[in-house]
Amino acid sequence: MSTIRKPSPPDMYDCIVVGAGHAGCEAAMALARMGHATLLLTGNADRIGHLSCNPAIGGLAKGHMVKEIDALGGMMGLWADEAGIQFRTLNSSKGPAVRATRAQIDRDAYLRVVRRDIFAQPNLRVWQDMAESIIVEEGRAAGVRTAYGQEFRAHHVLLTTGTFLQGRIHVGLSNFPGGRLGDAPATGLSASLRAIGLELGRLKTGTTPRLLRDSIDFSMMEVQPPDDPPRPFSFRGPGVRLPQLPCHVTWTNERTHEAIRAGFDRSPMFTGVIKGTGARYCPSIEDKVARFPEKERHQVFVEPEGLESPECYPNGIPTSLPLEVQKAMIATIPGLENAQIVRPGYAIEYDYADPVQLRSTLETKALRGLWLAGQINGTSGYEEAAAQGLWAALNVSCTLRSMPPFLPGRDTAYMAVLVDDLVTKGTREPYRMFTSRAEHRLLLRENNADARLTETGRALGLVDDTHWQLFSTKRAALHSLLDELENRRITPDAAARDIFSRLGEPAPTKGVSLADILRRPSLTLPDLAPFWEGVTRFADDVREEAETIVKYSGYLARQQELVARSARMEDTVLPEDMDYTVIPGLTREIVEKLGKVRPHTLGQAARISGVTPAALTCLEIQLRKMGQR
C-alpha cells in the first residue's frame, strides 16, 4: 500500500483506474499528466506494469500503435526504449506501410521504470487493494468499493482488469483461481458488472514455460542478432539505453509432436475443462499440432528475459499441457534437450465484456461514467491494451473538461481501427491487431505517427513543451526537405550525365526535379547527394519520411481520395437515442443490430455486418426528416 500524492488524497477523484497493467498505467499517467486527480487501484503494487506473457513490445501493427501512443504523449514507447534489449525492424525489405519495430524487453527493467514514473507522477495516487464493486448513484458510476472495505469516490471509473476477472489458471487437468501465476483474481467485480447490465463472456489465453538460461545449448540454434544501430520507438526520448542481446531460433520436430499428442487426453482444452475461446492468432502448441498435422515443425524463438535474468522465454510453444508433458516436449527440441523448466506454461480463463456494449469513447452504454479498456474488451496484447487505456483516458479528460470527444478516424490511427472494430463488430475471441485490418494502411505508417497525432495530443494537453518543440523542429525540417526536392532542378549537362552513369541510371533528356529522380525505383535519397550535398544534413527519420512521401506520392494521393469520398458518411452523426423501430424500410434484423451497436456515425453503421446500402439510405432519409422537424 503506497500513497504518494501530496497533500492528502481528495475526497473525490476525477477518475479511478482499476488495474495497473498496460492499459491502466497508460491511462493513469495520461490523466494525471493532464491535471486530473487520479487513483490507480491495483491488487499488487509490486507488479505495476508487469509483462505477464512474452518479454517483448511491438511487432506488426503493434509497433505502429506504440508509435501512435508516443505521438499523442503516452508512455509505452519511452518505457520500452529504456528497457529494450533487442530492437529489430520487421518487414524491412517490404513497403513502408508494413514495416514495424519490435523490441525484446528486460522484464525487470521495464517494471522498474514503469513503477518509478507511476510513483513519481503528481496528481496520481496508488492504492493496493482489490475492487469488489462499482458504486452507482443517480444513474452513473460514482466510485469503487474494495476488499479492504474502502469506498473511493470519483466522477469516472475506468476498468482495466486484464485477465483478472474471475481468472482461473490451468496446468493439465489441475486448475485454480488466479489473475496470472502468482497473483489472486478479482472475484467480486464480475457480479457487480452484471448487476449494472453488462453481458460478460469467457476468453482464454496462454503462456509458455520459462527455461533456465544456463541449461540451454545455444550452439544448436540459429542466432538472430539485433539491428545495429537500434531504432527506438519514441520520437521524443533519448533512445535505446541498454546493451543489445541476440535471440535464438530453433524448431520443434516429429518427436516433439509425438510427446504433445501423448498428452492430449490430459489437455484442459481437448477434454472440455476450458470453456473460454482462445486466441486464433496465438494458438497453443498443442492446438497447432492438432490443427496442422501435416506440418513437420514449428518455429521456436528463444528470447532472453533480461540482461541479468536467469530465465529465457521459448516463444512459440504456449501450452496448458501437464507439467510432465511439457518436460517431455521441451527435451525433444534441439538446444533444449537438457533445459530446466523454472515456471510451467499455463492457460488462463477470464471474464470479458463484449465491446459492442461500449460507446466509441470506450464508455459503457449501460452506465455513464464507467469505462472499459484493455483485455476486458476482448483484446490480446500489451500494445492493444495500452492504446485503449490512452484512448479511454483522453475521452475521460475530454468529458471532465466539456470538450468534444477524442475520436480519430480509421484513416488517422491504428488505435482508431482497433476501437472501431471492437465497438462496431464486437468479438467472441481475443482480438489482435494486424496491418491488414486497416483499409488505409499506407497512410498509417510507423514513421508518420507524429505527423498524424501529435497536434491532437498537444490540443488535448498531453504533449508537453519539449515534445512539441521536437515535433515542430522535425516537421519544419521535413517541409524544407520536400520543398528542396520538388524545386531543386537538375539539367542533363555533362556533369549530371556522369553522375547518372555512376549510379547505373540513364540520364534524363530534359531538366527534372530531384523529386522526379528520387521516384526512380532503384534510387534512394542518399543517392542524390552528388546532385545536392544538402541532403546529408537532414536527420535519418526526416529523410526516410521524405523519401516515402515522394516515392509513394501517387498511391498516397489515391488513398486520400478514398478517404475524402467516405468523409461525408463518417461526418454524419447518428443520435444516440435514435428509435430505429420507427424507420420505414429497415428489416427486423437490421433494427436489432443498429439498436445493439448504436453507431456513432453513418460510416460506422455501414461497417456493421448485415447493414445494407438500402438501409443506409433509409437512415439518411430519416436524418433529413429529423432535420426538417
Swiss-Prot record:
Record bears the keyword Protein transport: no
InterPro entries, sorted: FAD/NAD-bd_sf, GIDA_C_N, MnmG, MnmG-rel, MnmG-rel_CS, MnmG_C, MnmG_C_subdom, MnmG_C_subdom_sf
Superkingdom, taxonomy of origin: Bacteria
Cofactor(s) annotated in UniProt: FAD
Localization per record: Cytoplasm
BP term (GO), one: tRNA wobble uridine modification
Binding residues annotated for NAD(+), in chain numbering: 278-292
Keyword Transmembrane in annotation: no
Sites where the protein binds FAD: 19-24
One Gene Ontology term of the molecular function aspect: flavin adenine dinucleotide binding
Keywords: Cytoplasm, FAD, Flavoprotein, NAD, tRNA processing
Signal peptide: none
Cellular component aspect of the GO annotation: cytosol
Main location: cytoplasm
Assembly behavior: Homodimer. Heterotetramer of two MnmE and two MnmG subunits.
Family the entry assigns: Belongs to the MnmG family.
HAMAP family, A to Z: MnmG_GidA
Record's function text: NAD-binding protein involved in the addition of a carboxymethylaminomethyl (cmnm) group at the wobble position (U34) of certain tRNAs, forming tRNA-cmnm(5)s(2)U34.
Protein name: tRNA uridine 5-carboxymethylaminomethyl modification enzyme MnmG
Gene behind this protein: mnmG
